[in-house]
């Protein structure tokens, strides 16, 4: 018995490993894996079904077909273990060795491995520095290659055609060596001296100046170095021995009817063996060269097809015309090994069923059908039955369960008690898609789900199905209970707000019971407390909505956290008093003393969680739900057709609109407006009419007139069912009610453009045929869009998870003082997101000072929770520098301080939390709610685009930043800087509004002046860009020659004449080199200098500029010298929604990006070329000027002689994130991406915390390009992990050496995922072949740092509870201990079980 136990133990031993290395296999290595050579293409004997000897399924090579039984049947049973049968040569052992024993094929002629040949860039080609075409011609026997030139004039690696070879043979005889086929390439690779080659290349690299050559050399050096360091030999890329996969991994299964189902690999192997054997025979027969050559080529093709079918030429197809699945196809793609079997597995102990609602369940419970539970918990039941002695054997227990005896149900109840199960609903878009519940046994066959968790699962009860999983081990149960229980997941990890929020019926019920009604039954009563309120309501003495006075006792926490009672008489309603009974102690009465809509309820639960913690919140949420359901049922709110009240005014509004449209149609026909203008105006008219109708309708629905106690009429909020549903947030919205009772309004065509005839009817009136037809358009597009959206959103999530999966919190504090400056998000006159929302849950990077003093308000490294944020608001702090993941200094992972609060728990984040995946899920999960389409701006929107003034909304003082200005003759400020911002500051110093002020704007109010709300503070002409003089004097034209550089135009309407500068394309040859300009001179004719510089005031005019002044006129500073017409951008489509988010994360360059100044200096224009102009920026310090060619059609924002700072916009357009990173740094690009992504989500009303986007940005910035190597081993221009450069530089500086300088790179998420250090993770993401080829050549080690790699190799992930396990393992490895077997300590009940087990197994240790 003992040795059997020992033997069983030995069978299940696992290897401890820290990393996985991939490399090229040498022929000897392949032979060492092999258990014998496969010589014949036969598989199994079709009569005996026994494997053929030396065939592809040979039992002698690969092992026995039956457990412990040789093929001929001489040796059977366990006792012959390890015997090799002398008759059939089969070792007696387990069958499962047929899954691991490999064979090999000795190839008669070497063949190239197609991956290293054809996977671009071709490794063989790069190593030999030969073009791929040439190598292929040699390999497939079309030309010769010279291997050794000898004393002849032939170069090594020179390609010779058949004729050239024969000529050379005649000329030189055997002085030279030339071959064809893989042997030739093998010989070339073998004879390479890698180190020598490296030296030569490095010397060449230092001498060369051409950029392309440098790139090529760097690539080759990297490859050669990889070969030298990894110990791979180049000739191993040519196969001489082919490994054969174990037969159970390419099975051959007999089907009924004498046919076989087989894996495609067997066919591919058969071809290789057939051709190989034929080639051997031909070589033995010394057949003519041409025949042998053909056979060798066929062998090469067969091996290619086996390794990667279809990569070269046409794919080899099977009998049914479909391409065969080769080894490469087995591992790549969604159905490949990585994604199908390693990252996702099917699990036992699971079941699935339809879900129904369980409104009586507690939040931590779910209803599990008895039948399902019996099946899922079978092993536990068997164990219990045996333990109780109710069944003698497992078999007996099985019978009892199958018969469903009464005692089995009692046992099931015990087993299930406090044994959580996991419920999962596909698609699992975020971590709340799997939660743990305690099962409650129910009759029936559907799983019952608690209504409050539906929001997290995005579940409804229209036929959704869910899966149940049983956590088996104690650890798993503990984790399910402590971390995954639905009661522990009240807050959403995406934004830290409650996700267990009542919706629909519950909201309606609570809203109904907290509404008040004038003159309801029982109004004016004074009640002793909520209990009495409930009694009189039940007795029918008072209505739920009656306004009454009630004695209420509130509890409030004092400084020590003790509850203090306050009792007072409150004006409230009966319903609110009843609701107060379930509100936990510690919350103020004001929280329920209002009509509770969905928002208010959410806020109530949030407050409860923040003040009282988890347990009261859970109980409260449950109670709210029961109460809500109860009162919704009592309310009897239902929808009837009479609830949809159509406003009387509707008819006249529509006829007015029709009249206006007719008028515009007339104007169009008489030619006063263009077709485009007419269309836009018509749409505007209808949109306005629609708004008026819906306003009339809502006013009508919102209020009703009632008679109060004194007999006067009074308006009160309506009790119309439809209105109540929308107002409470239970279901429906104003827009939907508008379609029911107002008018349906304008519809869009499938391409997004708006149809100009609206649907004037509503659903209550009914649609006519035409209106119905127009409606179907939009409806179908909606469905098609949704389908596309889901797929796109899923793919975005996958890319995000892949890029961020290895980011885990690994230390407490990295000690950095860096951070990002947080300011409120203000667009125009609205605060889109106040500062408190942005800094809540972040850690301060430096002390926050009280504004205007040196007092420290919040010290550095403080986690800002709600109370701190209140303090910041009270002191009207405007900007806070907070720690951010992007600037975190931790090498691998991030530190807790830089991340801040764990949003789903409300305290600082724990070590080991997988923040990368959480971030990816939080951004990806709402992806399906984003729109797919690009918006066409039309109608109202396009008119708003051409703004011409700034009007402030609130009163306050004006603050201008980045401003240069001059005062014009009327004493007003004129802005002469490019990126001026105007902020409105209230009396507390908080920014309320923020606007961009364009160049040439005239300010009505100056910096620091007070303004009233609604005042206009700046004006400008939106259609032209002025040239403004900064000095006063007289104008002197230079190079302004009529007919050559300028032309005179007269306006027909006004009769005024103006000069227009000709574009260089329109000028005559004489005028090409002239630079028209306006010079400012004083009365004596001397140049006037620009103030603060020694440059004369001279304004060069670009083409198309209009000058309305004459030569010699007097002007004063701030006057407009010329105007440059702005071509309005037309209606540019804004990419919105999901595509925009994808573009940002993929860091795609926009079509016509803004041109930014690369250096600071003075702008001038050099010699123009055809279609381009040369922009020159000369730095003030006299270093080299920077030149850039800019297409002529780009509109420039700068004039000659203007000073720009680095990163200033020279030509407008969407900014490219790479430029922002290069010119303005990491923080600027972070701010840009975060704000742009947030804009898209904010538009859809989705809240995501900034830090999730920052996490992704950190991962996009994880590579750096080396600029100068210093004393490091990096190559110039090489792209390396940022963390590696940091570590290397730290070591170099510690030894007093020079570190490498580098610039950060911004990679798109797909690129970043593929560029990770871990090849396993990259290979399982995309482009598997390329990743594996690259890794194998370089002999890469995968340190298994990320989550994905560890899932693939089947270990605990280094995050969450697995983080501690890995830390512990590392510590043990460092100390050199053996891993201790984990001591199982459960409750005392299982201690006796442990004793029993130890007694059984302990005997084997003490020999």
From Swiss-Prot:
GO terms for molecular function: DNA binding; DNA-directed RNA polymerase activity; magnesium ion binding; zinc ion binding. Its cofactor is Mg(2+); Zn(2+). Belongs to the RNA polymerase beta' chain family. Keywords: DNA-directed RNA polymerase, Magnesium, Metal-binding, Nucleotidyltransferase, Transcription, Transferase, Zinc. This is DNA-directed RNA polymerase subunit beta'. The lineage of its organism: Bacteria, Pseudomonadati, Pseudomonadota, Gammaproteobacteria, Enterobacterales. DNA-dependent RNA polymerase catalyzes the transcription of DNA into RNA using the four ribonucleoside triphosphates as substrates. It comes from the Bacteria. The RNAP catalytic core consists of 2 alpha, 1 beta, 1 beta' and 1 omega subunit. When a sigma factor is associated with the core the holoenzyme is formed, which can initiate transcription. It is an enzyme of class 2 (transferase). The gene is rpoC. Its EC number is 2.7.7.6. Zn(2+) 2 binds at residues 814, 888, 895, 898. GO terms for biological process: DNA-templated transcription. Zn(2+) 1 binds at residues 70, 72, 85, 88. CDD domains: RNAP_beta'_C, RNAP_beta'_N. The keyword Ligase does not apply. It comes from Salmonella paratyphi B (strain ATCC BAA-1250 / SPB7). It catalyses: RNA(n) + a ribonucleoside 5'-triphosphate = RNA(n+1) + diphosphate. Pfam families: RNA_pol_Rpb1_1, RNA_pol_Rpb1_2, RNA_pol_Rpb1_3, RNA_pol_Rpb1_4, RNA_pol_Rpb1_5. Mg(2+) binds at residues 460, 462, 464. InterPro entries: DNA-dir_RpoC_beta_prime (IPR045867), DNA-dir_RpoC_beta_prime_bact (IPR012754), RNA_pol_asu (IPR000722), RNA_pol_N (IPR006592), RNA_pol_Rpb1_1 (IPR007080), RNA_pol_Rpb1_3 (IPR007066), RNA_pol_Rpb1_3_sf (IPR042102), RNA_pol_Rpb1_4 (IPR007083). GO terms for cellular component: DNA-directed RNA polymerase complex. Transmembrane segments: none annotated. Binds 1 Mg(2+) ion per subunit. Binds 2 Zn(2+) ions per subunit.
């Amino acid at each position: 018995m003992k040795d059997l136990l020992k033997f069983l133990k030995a069978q299940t031993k696992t290897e401890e490993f820290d990393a996985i290395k991939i490399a090229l296999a040498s022929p000897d290595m392949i032979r060492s894996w092999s258990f014998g050579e496969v010589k014949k293409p036969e598989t199994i004997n079709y009569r005996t079904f026994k494997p053929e000897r030396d065939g592809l399924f040979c039992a002698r090579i690969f092992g026995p077909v039956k457990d412990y039984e040789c093929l001929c049947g001489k040796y059977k049973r366990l006792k012959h273990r390890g015997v090799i049968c002398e008759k059939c040569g089969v070792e007696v052992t387990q069958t499962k060795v047929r899954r691991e024993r490999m064979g090999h094929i000795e190839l008669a002629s070497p063949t190239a491995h197609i991956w290293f040949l054809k996977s671009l860039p071709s490794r063989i080609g790069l190593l030999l520095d030969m073009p791929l075409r040439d190598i292929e011609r040699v390999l497939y026997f079309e030309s010769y290659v010279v291997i050794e030139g000898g004393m002849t004039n032939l170069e090594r690696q020179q390609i010779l055609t058949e004729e050239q070879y024969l000529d050379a043979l005649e000329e030189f005889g055997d002085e030279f060596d030339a071959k064809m086929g893989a042997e030739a390439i093998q010989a070339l690779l073998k004879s390479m001296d890698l180190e020598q080659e490296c030296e030569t290349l490095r010397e060449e690299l230092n001498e060369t100046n051409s950029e392309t050559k440098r790139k090529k050399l760097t690539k080759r050096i990297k490859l050669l170095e990889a070969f030298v360091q990894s110990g791979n030999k180049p000739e191993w890329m040519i196969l001489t021995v082919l490994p054969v996969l174990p037969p159970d991994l390419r099975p051959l299964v007999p089907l009924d009817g004498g046919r076989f189902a087989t894996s495609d690999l067997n066919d591919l192997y058969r071809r290789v063996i057939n051709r190989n054997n034929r080639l051997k025979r031909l070589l033995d027969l010394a057949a003519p060269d041409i025949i042998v050559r053909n056979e060798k080529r066929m062998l090469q093709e067969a091996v290619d097809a086996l390794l990667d079918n279809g990569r070269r030429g046409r794919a080899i197809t099977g009998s049914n015309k479909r391409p065969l699945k080769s080894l490469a196809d087995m591992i790549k793609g969604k159905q490949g090994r990585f994604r199908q079997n390693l990252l996702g597995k099917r699990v036992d102990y699971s079941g699935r069923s339809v879900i129904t609602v369980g409104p009586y369940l507690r939040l931590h419970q779910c209803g599990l059908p008895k039948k399902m539970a019996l099946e899922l918990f079978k092993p536990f039941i068997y164990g219990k039955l045996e333990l109780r002695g109710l069944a003698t054997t497992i078999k007996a227990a099985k019978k009892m369960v199958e018969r469903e005896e009464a005692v089995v149900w009692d046992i099931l109840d015990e087993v299930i008690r406090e044994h959580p199960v996991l419920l999962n609903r596909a698609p699992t878009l975020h971590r709340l898609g799997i939660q743990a519940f305690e099962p409650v046994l129910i009759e029936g066959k559907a799983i019952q789900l608690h209504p409050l968790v539906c929001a997290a699962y995005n579940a409804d009860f229209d036929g959704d199905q869910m899966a149940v999983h049983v956590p088996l081990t104690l650890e798993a149960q503990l984790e399910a209970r402590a971390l995954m229980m639905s009661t522990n997941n009240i807050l959403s990890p995406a934004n830290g707000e409650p996700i267990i929020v009542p919706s629909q019926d519950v909201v309606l019920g609570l809203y109904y019971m907290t509404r008040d009604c004038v003159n309801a039954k029982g109004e004016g009563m004074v009640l002793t407390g909520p209990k009495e309120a409930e009694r009189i309501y039940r007795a029918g003495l008072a209505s739920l909505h009656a306004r009454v006075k009630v004695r209420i006792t509130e509890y409030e926490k004092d400084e020590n956290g003790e509850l203090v009672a306050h009792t007072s008489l409150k004006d409230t309603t009966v319903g609110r008093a009843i609701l107060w009974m379930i509100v936990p102690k510690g919350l103020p009465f004001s929280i329920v003393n209002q009509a509770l809509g969905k928002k208010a309820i959410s806020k109530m639960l949030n407050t409860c969680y923040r003040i009282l913690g988890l347990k009261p919140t859970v109980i409260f949420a449950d109670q709210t739900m029961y109460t809500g359901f109860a009162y919704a049922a009592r309310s009897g709110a239902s929808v009837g057709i009479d609830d949809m009240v159509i406003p009387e005014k509707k008819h006249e509004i529509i006829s007015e609109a029709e009249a206006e449209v007719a008028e515009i149609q007339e104007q169009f026909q008489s030619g006063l407006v263009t077709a485009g203008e007419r269309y836009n105006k018509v749409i505007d008219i209808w949109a306005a009419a629609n708004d008026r109708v819906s306003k009339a309708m809502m006013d009508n629905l919102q209020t009703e007139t009632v008679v109060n106690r004194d007999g006067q009429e009074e308006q009160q909020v309506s009790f119309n069912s439809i209105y109540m549903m929308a107002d409470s947030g239970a279901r429906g919205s104003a827009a939907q009610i508008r379609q029911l009772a107002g008018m349906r309004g304008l519809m869009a065509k499938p391409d997004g453009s708006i149809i100009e005839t609206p649907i004037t009817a509503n659903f209550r009136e009914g649609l006519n045929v035409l209106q119905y037809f127009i409606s179907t358009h939009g409806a179908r597009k909606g469905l098609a869009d949704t389908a596309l959206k889901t797929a796109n959103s899923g793919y975005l999530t996958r890319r995000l998870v892949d890029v961020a999966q290895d980011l885990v919190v690994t230390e407490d504090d990295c000690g950095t003082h860096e951070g990002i400056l947080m300011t409120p998000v203000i667009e125009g006159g609205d605060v889109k997101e106040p500062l408190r929302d942005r800094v809540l849950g972040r850690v301060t990077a430096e002390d926050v000072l009280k504004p205007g003093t040196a007092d420290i308000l919040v010290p550095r490294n403080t986690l800002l929770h709600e109370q701190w944020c209140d303090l910041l608001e009270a002191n009207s702090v405007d900007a806070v520098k907070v720690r951010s993941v992007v600037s975190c200094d931790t090498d691998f992972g991030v530190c807790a301080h830089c991340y801040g609060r764990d949003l789903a728990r409300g305290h600082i984040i724990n070590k080991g939390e997988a923040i990368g995946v959480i971030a990816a899920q939080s951004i990806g999960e709402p992806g399906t709610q984003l729109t797919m389409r690009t918006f066409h701006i039309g109608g109202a929107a396009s008119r708003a685009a051409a703004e011409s003034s700034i009007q402030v909304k609130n009163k306050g003082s004006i603050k201008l930043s980045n401003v240069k200005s001059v005062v014009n003759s009327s004493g007003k400020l004129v802005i002469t800087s490019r990126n001026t911002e105007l902020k409105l500051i209230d009396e507390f110093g908080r920014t309320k509004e923020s606007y961009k002020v364009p160049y040439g704007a005239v300010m009505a109010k100056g910096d620091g002046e007070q303004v009233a709300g609604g005042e206009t503070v700046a004006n400008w002409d939106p259609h032209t860009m002025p040239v403004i003089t900064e000095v006063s004097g007289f104008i002197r034209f230079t190079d302004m020659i009529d007919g050559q550089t300028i032309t005179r135009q007269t306006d027909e309407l006004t009769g005024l004449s103006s000069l227009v500068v000709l574009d260089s394309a329109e000028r005559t040859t004489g005028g090409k080199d002239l630079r028209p300009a306006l010079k400012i001179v004083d009365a004596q004719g001397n140049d006037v200098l620009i103030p603060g510089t020694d440059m004369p005031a001279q304004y060069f005019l670009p083409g198309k500029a209009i000058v309305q002044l004459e030569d010699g006129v007097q002007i004063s500073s701030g006057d407009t010298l010329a105007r440059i017409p702005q071509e309005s951008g037309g209606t540019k489509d804004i990419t919105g929604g999901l595509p925009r988010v994808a573009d940002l994360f993929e860091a795609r360059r926009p079509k016509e990006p803004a041109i930014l100044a690369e250096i600071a200096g003075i702008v001038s224009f050099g010699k123009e070329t055809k279609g381009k102009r040369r922009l020159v920026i000369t730095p003030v310090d006299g270093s080299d000027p920077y030149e850039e060619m800019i297409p002529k059609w780009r509109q420039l924002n700068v004039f000659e002689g203007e000073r720009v700072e680095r990163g200033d916009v020279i030509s407008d357009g969407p900014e490219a994130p790479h430029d922002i990173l290069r010119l303005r740094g990491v923080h600027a690009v972070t701010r840009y991406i975060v704000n742009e992504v947030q804009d898209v989500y904010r538009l859809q009303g989705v809240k995501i915390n900034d830090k999730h986007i920052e996490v992704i940005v950190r991962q996009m910035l994880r590579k750096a390009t080396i600029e100068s190597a210093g004393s490091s081993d990096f190559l110039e221009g090489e792209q390396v992990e940022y963390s590696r450069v940091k570590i290397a530089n730290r070591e170099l500086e510690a030894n007093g050496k020079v570190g490498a300088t580098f610039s950060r790179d911004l990679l798109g998420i797909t690129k970043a995922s593929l560029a990770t250090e871990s090849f396993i993770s990259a290979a399982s993401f995309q482009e598997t072949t390329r990743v594996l080829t690259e890794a194998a050549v370089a002999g890469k080690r995968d340190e298994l740092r990320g989550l994905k790699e560890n899932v693939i190799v089947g270990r605990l992930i280094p995050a969450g509870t697995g983080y501690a396990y890995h830390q512990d393992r590392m510590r043990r490895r460092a100390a050199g201990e053996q891993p201790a077997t984990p001591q199982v300590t459960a409750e005392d009940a299982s201690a006796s079980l442990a004793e029993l087990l130890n007694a059984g197994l302990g005997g084997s240790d003490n020999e």
